[in-house]
Amino acid sequence: MALQSLFLILLAGAAQLAQAHPKIFEQSRANAVETFDDAFPGDGETQADSVFSGIATFGRLPYWKCLNDKSQSFDIAFLGAPFDTGTSYRPGARFGPSGIREGSRRLNLYGGYNVPMETNPFNNWAKIVDCGDIPLTSYDNAVAIKQIENGHFELLTRKPTSYSEKDGYALDGSVLPRVITLGGDHTIVLPILRSVSRAYGPVSIIHFDSHLDSWKPKVFGGGKSSVGSINHGTYFYHASQEGLVSNDSNIHAGIRTTLSGLSDYDNDADCGFEIIEAREIDTIGIDAIIKRIRDRVGDGIAYLSIDIDVLDPAYAPATGTPESAGWTTRELRTILRGLDGIKLVGADIVEVAPAYDFAEVTTLAAADILFEVMSIMVKTPVYKEQAKQQSRFY
């Protein structure tokens, strides 16, 4: 009888515990969620949900139709240039801007802090937006090149959100916002440099690529017409001839292409460039490459152009003219971080052709590379310390 009573007491206690357990569990879970949300930055499930919803912008940045709406200001703008009719081998880079944006979806998922660079470009002083793409014709290269120049210049000469009261490096002494262009084949750099030169004058060039892209038109493409002479292998030759680049402060890095002959190197030197070949990473190392770039550019302003084919095809297969024996993504990102402190007035990444990609390998690499570029720009605003005069641009 006593044993039966004990059993009934235990059974009743178990029932009460089972009834109370859901409430205890829910309270425990609520406390855990509250603790997690309080302890870590970011916006949790709101940001996670946005990865799969809405239109794709770079890093989930705000989208503005900047070319149509002049009332909005910014410090850094992403701008697509979907142009690929200057290619010599595989086309498809016109889809690069959309592919790179897709590859960037997760950049800001957990807050966007760049650990090696010790900065968060998404949550800093700079107002950064995605301005969409420049509307371009695919039927007339001469018109498209002019459209790129005009679209870029329209954004480049806006009044920035920050530091507009400072003295800048523009020809009129003003501080200008910076544009990061998503290509597109490498031809787009000629109209971009025309835009940059109109605002700043000649600038130093830091160029990551497997190819020189400074060939004379008769060597690369035959130069059958004035329009046909401008392509993704000749734009630096034209930029040099037009006085858009600074003399003897420009540098290529990652070069490993075949040549028509050693005269190509002589012509490249005449265009004002020094060359770091891809294979030199095995002999002089990353630190020496960084030093050569910094020594070449000096303390002046610079423009950064990155062809995705500077990477080995194992790391970036989706490009128009792939070359084996290139750098790894890790090596390139490390070199870029070594450029911290250089005054970049603009940048681009080009030759991403998503149709040749698998598992978004190339577009992810391109997005991560631009994450480093963003970080450099945010860490180094481009202005002088003196008070400025009224800008003629705004």
UniProtKB/Swiss-Prot annotation:
Cofactor: Mn(2+)
Keywords tagged on the record: Hydrolase, Manganese, Metal-binding, Signal
Record-listed E.C. numbers: 3.5.3.11
One Pfam short name: Arginase
PROSITE patterns linked to this entry: ARGINASE_1 (PS01053), ARGINASE_2 (PS51409)
GO molecular function (one): agmatinase activity
An example Gene Ontology CC term for this record: endoplasmic reticulum
TM spans (from-to): none
Provenance organism: Schizosaccharomyces pombe (strain 972 / ATCC 24843) (Fission yeast)
GO BP field: putrescine biosynthetic process from arginine, via agmatine; urea metabolic process
Annotated residues for binding of Mn(2+) 2: 209, 211, 307, 309
Entry similarity comment: Belongs to the arginase family.
Name of this protein: Putative agmatinase 1
Catalytic activity entry: agmatine + H2O = urea + putrescine
Signal peptide: 1-20
Binding site for Mn(2+) 1: 186, 209, 213, 307
SUPFAM superfamilies assigned: Arginase/deacetylase
Gene3D superfamilies: Ureohydrolase domain
